[in-house]
């Protein structure tokens, strides 16, 4: 999806979100999907969530730092019927002396902690919430 032109990218993202409605392991699918995003060093400002892009601008812009990937995972799940009523928070956490941005779903499931995998809140030592939806 990430190598497509903007309208095709939006369509492919919609098709992926639709596939999550019946997926056996939707969190793992989201982790794998966003692991293919092209990575940049810095895109979003942690201190200005009000200036973060909406879901479609994020996908169209095609720039993904660690925070943008966590936000993209959040938008992907939020825009499904299956997960639209769930609780989503983005936290900072330390992994091997590296600051990470993670998505926490329903105070239980953690995405973007480790590449291509799903973790649990119990795997995190300490986090700081920076945004919730």
Role assignments for model-derived ranges:
Residues 1-133:
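A structural boundary/capping signal
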């Amino acid at each position: 999806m990430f190598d497509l032109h903007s309208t095709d990218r939006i369509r492919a993202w919609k098709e992926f979100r639709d596939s999550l409605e019946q997926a056996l392991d939707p969190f793992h699918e989201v982790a794998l999907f966003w692991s293919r995003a092209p990575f940049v060093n810095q895109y979003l400002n942690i201190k200005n969530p009000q200036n973060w892009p909406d879901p479609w601008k994020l996908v169209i812009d095609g720039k993904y730092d660690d925070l943008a990937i966590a936000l993209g995972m959040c938008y992907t799940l939020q825009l499904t019927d299956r997960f639209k009523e769930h609780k989503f928070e983005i936290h900072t956490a330390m992994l091997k002396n590296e600051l990470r941005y993670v998505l926490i779903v329903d105070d239980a499931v953690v995405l973007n902690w480790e590449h291509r995998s799903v973790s649990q809140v119990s795997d995190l030592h300490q986090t700081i919430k920076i945004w919730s939806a």
